[in-house]
């Protein structure tokens, strides 16, 4: 799905292998807060290796004696990885259950603490990653490329995981927009997200191709750093250009839905021209009830560091909620993901 999308730093020449083993992809979830210690929800921090999020949630539900719907999470995480994440269990008026019964070589309970609010999808600050890429080839320019990514970021593309194996989530969305009924709410949400993500990626790629990844268009919608607050100005002012250059604001692209574009003027015209061939997709998203939203055009990994030794690269960084680690790797090298006989299940936070 991402083969035709533009690269911010040009197509990479280095090659490597991602996830040769689970320990090569480490994800530590950061909620951005500590559970308060009281309330009717139990937050459980779990370390899992080679297990998917939904399956572990089912084990927790059985151990706690509750319905599966009573167990929630902030985000799905890659299966073939070592991940630490939080689960929430709704247990009003009940004592804490013995969750140690689910522990095994691949599952460890790290922390259990009560909280007064439900753990919801997206209810997190972000994720810390430690990636080990092996079998490096043609890596002569890798050091300078790493530096460029640390300084300028990468396209904030939605990763392959969003679209399903072979793009099957998009095929399902297309069928749904053509009238096929999808009764499963989770599947319906998955297919809508895939369609919306494809349109976002198309606009980001088009801006990069036109040399507009770091350049303001009149009417661009920008987002304040560290928040989801957005605004647009009719013209390109020196003040706004300086704020963009300093990182105080970020360029954005639309996540399609009902309502008017938050951009205006030349920027809105550009976005509409890119999406003109996707009229049926836009119409389908609007009829499904999704509202317009914005997402940063670029993604700058935080606290990025690396160690390059021979044919192995160890790369660590932090990404905010909604960002994909694989989008960072894509800009860095042509990484072949080891096939372990199952589809990786991951959310936007773990690239997963």
UniProtKB/Swiss-Prot annotation:
Print the keywords alphabetically.
Isomerase, tRNA processing
- Name the chemical reaction catalysed here: uridine(13) in tRNA = pseudouridine(13) in tRNA
What are this entry's molecular-function GO terms?
A: RNA binding; tRNA pseudouridine(13) synthase activity
Q: Which residues form a coiled coil?
A: none
Q: Does the keyword Isomerase apply?
A: yes
Indicate the segments forming the TRUD domain, all copies: 153-299
Q: Name one GO biological process term.
A: tRNA pseudouridine synthesis
E.C. number: 5.4.99.27
Active-site residues (renumbered): 78
List the record's Gene Ontology CC terms alphabetically.
cytosol
InterPro entries according to UniProt: PsdUridine_synth_cat_dom_sf (IPR020103), PsdUridine_synth_TruD (IPR001656), PsdUridine_synth_TruD_CS (IPR020119), PsdUridine_synth_TruD_insert (IPR011760), TruD_catalytic (IPR042214), TruD_insert_sf (IPR043165), TruD_pseudoU_synthase (IPR050170)
**Which one Pfam family would you cite for this protein?**
TruD
Q: Give the enzyme's main class according to its UniProt record, as a single word.
A: isomerase
NCBIfam families in UniProt: tRNA_TruD_broad
Purpose: Responsible for synthesis of pseudouridine from uracil-13 in transfer RNAs.
Q: Which family does it belong to?
A: Belongs to the pseudouridine synthase TruD family.
Query: What name appears for this protein in its UniProt entry?
Result: tRNA pseudouridine synthase D
Species whose genome carries this gene: Aeromonas hydrophila subsp. hydrophila (strain ATCC 7966 / DSM 30187 / BCRC 13018 / CCUG 14551 / JCM 1027 / KCTC 2358 / NCIMB 9240 / NCTC 8049)
What are the top taxonomic ranks of the organism? Bacteria, Pseudomonadati, Pseudomonadota, Gammaproteobacteria, Aeromonadales
């Amino acid at each position: 799905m991402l083969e035709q999308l533009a690269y911010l730093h040009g197509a990479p020449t280095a090659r490597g292998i991602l996830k040769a083993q689970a320990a090569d992809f480490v994800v530590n979830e950061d909620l951005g807060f500590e559970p308060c210690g009281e309330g009717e929800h139990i937050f459980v921090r779990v370390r899992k290796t080679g297990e998917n999020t939904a399956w572990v949630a089912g084990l927790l539900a059985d151990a706690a004696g509750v319905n599966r719907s009573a167990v929630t999470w902030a985000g799905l995480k890659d299966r073939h990885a070592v991940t630490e994440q939080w689960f929430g269990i709704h247990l009003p008026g009940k004592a804490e259950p013995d969750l140690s019964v689910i522990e095994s070589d691949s599952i460890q309970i790290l922390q259990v603490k009560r909280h007064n609010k439900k753990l919801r999808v997206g209810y997190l600050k972000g994720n810390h990653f430690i990636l080990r890429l092996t079998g490096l080839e043609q890596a002569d320019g890798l050091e300078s490329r790493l530096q460029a990514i640390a300084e300028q970021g990468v396209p904030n593309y939605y990763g392959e995981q969003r679209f399903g194996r072979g793009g099957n989530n998009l095929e399902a969305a297309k069928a749904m927009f053509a009238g096929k009924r999808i009764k499963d709410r989770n599947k319906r949400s998955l297919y809508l997200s895939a369609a919306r993500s494809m349109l976002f990626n198309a606009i980001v790629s088009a801006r990069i191709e036109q040399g507009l990844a770091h350049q303001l268009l009149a009417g661009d919608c920008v987002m304040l750093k560290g928040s989801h607050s957005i605004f647009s100005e009719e013209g390109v002012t020196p003040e706004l250009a300086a704020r963009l250059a300093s990182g105080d604001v970020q360029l954005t692209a639309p996540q399609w839905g009902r309502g008017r574009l938050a951009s205006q003027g030349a920027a809105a015209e550009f976005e509409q021209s890119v999406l003109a061939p996707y009229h049926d997709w836009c119409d389908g998203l609007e009829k499904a009830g999704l509202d317009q939203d914005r997402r940063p055009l670029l993604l700058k990994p935080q606290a990025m560091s690396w160690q390059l030794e021979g044919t192995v690269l160890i790369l660590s960084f932090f990404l905010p909620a909604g960002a994909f680690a694989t989008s960072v790797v894509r800009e860095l090298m042509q990484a072949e993901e080891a096939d372990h006989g199952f589809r990786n299940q991951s959310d936007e936070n773990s690239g997963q």
